[in-house]
Amino acid sequence: MRIVSVKQGVAPISSAIANAYIDFSKMTASIVAVTVEGPGGRRATGYGFNSNGRYAQPGLLAERFVPRLTEATEAEITGADGGLDPAGAWAAMMRNEKPGGHGERSVAVGVLDMALWDAAAKLEGVPLWRLLADRYNGGQADEAAWVYAAGGYYYPGKGVDQLVEEMKRYLGMGYSTVKMKIGGAPGTALKQALAEDLARIEAVLKLLGGDGSRLCVDVNGRFGLHAALTYAAALRPMNLRWYEEPLDPLDYSTHATLAEHYGPPIATGENLFSMLDARNLIRHGGLRADRDVLQFDPALSYGLVEYLRTLQMLVEHGWSPRRCVPHGGHQFALNIAVGLGLGGNESYPEVFAPFGGFADDVPVADSRVRMPDIPGIGFEAKNALYAVLKTLD
C-alpha cells in the first residue's frame, strides 16, 4: 500500500444558531481527500472532515500531519493481510508528538483517520460498518441504529412556538426522540435562562405527550456545580432521556458530585479527545454504567484508531459499548455504531449542512435507520456532502 496524494481544504458551516456556550457564526470544518494505491495499482480515495463545534485545522494538517502521512513507508501503512492499515498510518502521523494536550491536534488527526478508514473499506469493496463488524465484533453488525434528532438551538427571534414547530418537523421525519439546547443563549443570565428553559422544555414535552424519555437536553458545558444542581432539581421530575454536558468536561469531581444528587441519566464526553481523558472520566467522574451515556466523538478524538482503544478501556472498566452514543451526527459515527454495536448515534436533520445527516435515500423510522450497502463510509450517497468533498479531486 502507498499514499498517492493527500489534499485538504476548509468548508464553512457558519450559522446564526447558538448553544449556551458558543455561537456558530464563524464555524468551519476541514475536509480532506486521501488517495491510496493497493496491489495491482488499484486505487481508492477516502474522504474525511471534522465534526461541528471545533474549527478547521489547515495549519496543523499542512505543517505536521499531512507530511508525516505522505512520508509513511509502505510497510508502515500495510496490514498483515496486505490491505491498508489505518493504525499504522495513525502511528506514522503521531510520530514525535508528546503525550497530553489533546485539543486541536486530535481534530487534525481525526480528519485524516476518517479518510483512511473510508479508503480502507473501499479497497475491500465493503461498507465500513461491515469491515468493522468483521474485524472487531465477531462479524456481528446491528440491523439498524437508534438515532435521535439534535436541534433546539437558540436563534435570534426564535421563541417557544418556533421551537415546537422545529421539533414537530423532526417527528415528521421519523425521529421519535429529540434533543434541545438549554442553559440560555450566550450572555443570558442563568436565573433568567432557567425560567425560559422550563417553559421551552414543557412546551416540547407537551408535543411528546409528556413522555420525558423522548427528550434530551444539552447544556454544552456551561454550568458550575450550583447551576447544574439547580437545573437538576427542576429536571428530575420530568424523567428526561438524559441531561447532557452540564459541566466542564474535564471537571471530573464535580461530575461525581452531580451524579450523587441526580439519579436520572447524565450524558457527557463529546469534548474529551483521547482514551486517557475518557479513562479519567470513568475513573473519577462518578458516572453510572447502568444508565449514563458516553458521547466521545471519533472524528474529533484522533479518529477510529483511538476510539477502538477507548472502547476497549470501557469494557475493562465494566461499561458496555451500548452506553456509547457518539456526538457528531454524521455517517462516520453511524457506521461505527452499527458495526461495533454502540447504543446509537446523533443526527442533525436541519443544522450543519451538508455534513450532518445520513445518506439521501435512507429513511428514519421510529428513530431507527438502516445502513446502505455502499463501499466505504457512504459519502457518495449524500449528494450535497459529496459535492463539497469532490472539490478536492
Protein language model annotation of sequence segments:
Residues 138-256, 261:
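Metal-dependent enolase-superfamily TIM-barrel catalytic cores that perform enediolate-based chemistry
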Residues 32, 43, 112, 125, ...:
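Conserved, mostly hydrophobic/aromatic
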Residues 1-54, 58, 64, 355:
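Structured beta-strand/loop patches that form or line metal/cofactor-binding pockets in enzymes
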Residues 10, 376-393:
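Extended hydrophobic packing segments that form well-structured cores
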